């Protein structure tokens, strides 16, 4: 039944009218203004998914643009490949489309909500927890002449195990010298429903140990996979964003550089 439902949704998605970004001219050098224009919570405006809180609390977006621009500015005019994991309707993909004028963008999600199209955008249905879907993804990028990515951004489920599994799997598709980004990597510490593995060290601690080249015990990653990450990670930078909920800053972003 699930396969039939997916087949139906795929059919509907293919024939659904989409917004053609190739026909939209937006002149902006500011990634934050693009984030705000397309209303993604990566921007600074009050458009985050945390905005609609019952007590009327106003919550700003994450304000990640300043960090993205810091690390991505040298890639802005280059022909690069970008992979986004977890794109929903595609607001951030549309923003990156305008910011990276020559980039080819690959967007994956487990939902068929993506509403944009372009000659430079490739949407692919993929549930990253499904071995079958990951195999299809592997074949898909293989058919695209063995695509590897200059930038990979994980803004997916934010579930603890998924964050680590995505890092372990998709890091292999990152080019030498590329950047792997994890948005909201501390969410499992802030929201208990995202913490699906009991007694595991936090993502924050995982990143710290990877940065220090220290092997650690994990219920998710094998020692060989941890060694592989340590061997290939050059440096890690982490930052706090602007999203405050109930007096707590819940915005965290990590930039992981792969060795050349």
Pin down the residues of each PLM region.
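A short alpha-helical cap/connector motif
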Residues: 1-153, 157-181, 186-260
